[in-house]
Amino acid sequence: GEQVILMRNHEISFYQWHLAGAGPFKLRANFPGGVTRLVWDEKKRYLVDSRQTLKNALRNCSGGISPWGWLSCEETLMFGHGHVYLCPTDRNDCMKTQIIKSYGRMNHEAVCIDPRDNYAYLSEDRDDSCFYRFVPKIKNKPFVGKLQALAIKGEKKFITYSKFDAKKRYQVEWVDLDNQDKDDLRFQGQKLGAAVFKRGEGIFFDSNKVYFCCTTGGPIEKGQVFRYSPDKEE
């Protein structure tokens, strides 16, 4: 139609300066994260609606589109946070928001979905992060399954930001993780041989491939872009 729905993350940290009434700015502790759903009329070029659809969240950094709605990722572990939330795009309230704990608790950055099998691919914004996927047991129950971390075949704890040769193709495998409510998934994965990435960022699924980038990866720490082919496991 003529209307576009934009799901806008609130990437705001826990402590921010806020205007307190008519007085001076002061530091106030609150939960300023979340998601706002905006409806834009392309033809008339005006904002039709703007409402918050996720509240009580913190530092919603990136996320990704999915068959079920917008997936919003928290990039913080403060106060028990660090989850992915499902925000339906067809609702203008917070009633149907869902925490996806099976996607793990970590410094989440972004996520994408392979619509062929509903596998989720997730990045983590840390200097010593892993690259993750969530494998549903069955396709129509996308949030029930197992969490895994990517490993390079034949390489234990491969350091991608200094050893990766862009001219080569690497065969990969996945190690299973014990998905508890702790910020230790990367340590679990690397103990089992998972590859190490430097500040995982955006992810996108296109033409049956997963593309993702790292902010400070590479020999000069100016970033890397990776392509993963699920069909070939490389």
For each feature predicted by the language model, list its residue ranges.
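Sequence/structural signature of beta-propeller domains
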Residues: 1-234
